[in-house]
Amino acid sequence: MTTSPPRTHQDTGELPPLLPAPRRLLKHPRLMHYNRLAALVLLSNAAFLWAAWPLAAPTLGHAALANLALAVVVRQQYVINLFFRLATSAPTHWPLKVRWTLGKVYHFGGLHVGGALAGTAWFLALTITTPNGPLMAVGWALLALLALIIATALPPFRSRRHDHFEKIHRFGGWSALALFWTHTLLSGQGPVPLAVLAVVTFSVALPWLRLRKVDVRTERPSPHVALARFDYGETPFAGSSTAISRSPLKEWHSFANVPAPGRSGFRLTISRAGDWTGSFIDDLPERVWVKGITTAGVANIEVLFKKVVYVATGSGIGPCLPHLLAAEVPSRLVWATRDPRATYGDALVDEILAVQPHAQVWDTSRHGKPDMVRLAHDAYRDFGAEAVICISNKRLTWQVVHGLERRGIPAYGAIWDS
């Protein structure tokens, strides 16, 4: 383990040169795979409009329903896990460029965005052409609700008022689904739309059918973090996450599961990052709500590569820990955090060092904030890794991922799309 200041700029050498301009442009955050998938859905709808024009009202309705169904179903937990299973089934002898692209599977939310926007546009066209009074009233009510959901899902509102975004998305989504049923029944569109709506409704309801309140044992090694332990009959796979709540109709928060090999149950590392996490750490509740199934997360893509580097800051160590413990893929850890033993406790730090004796741990309380792009690159180069996985805050994650990818190094990190 390295706890002293890492090597100087002279020792590390220069970062690799930037990719040529055309390739570098494709690595820009605005052209990330999430946005490409959203654009693909929108362009596919535009192509359909061009090829099928003019469109009859039933076709407009079917197009709206198909796109809105896409927006809902791609967020279903079983579908998400299927996406990851398919993408990570590629063997490591496949070309790196192919595996690099498959590793972006967690950008599937672009399909959600594209489907929601296209579906709303199709439904607007349908409503404008609807002559029926009651049907038109339901249509405009549904459009107003869809517009509210889309507006509050935009990053400026979602990032500042995430609790309100979550409530509007949940209750607005349920209300929109009820209105869609009403509209479909009034319009008499036949069995196919009803079958699609039934699938969408089941997709929405399924996680709530598994809603339950479970016991939790919580340790607080410092005022900054809580370690929550669960053992209610489920041992999740490494790289998955669990959503928990203290009030199921209000806020839900997802955290990376940390199962221990050979033991039942799992842990969550909960860092103080807002009112909800702060009250959880202060109160140490004995029971919380869970729903649905555990869902695959970004670090699951590690199996696509022969060696990976994990870059974490602060409580970002939580999502990395299950992969470090499972050791399915050779890995090297770079962890920057303030006073790790005082913040997270000796037991957790010793557990990390037992499986990562060569980890580079930068104590920010002693050495200040490091250049994480350079640290990530040095570990990638020295370890002979094929990819870097960064778990940190939004600003630093984008800085590391973009800083490496525009130099031709596969890099991955959360995209904060929910």
Q: Which residue stretches match the model-derived regions?
A:
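FNR-like FAD-binding dehydrogenase module
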Residues: M1-S418
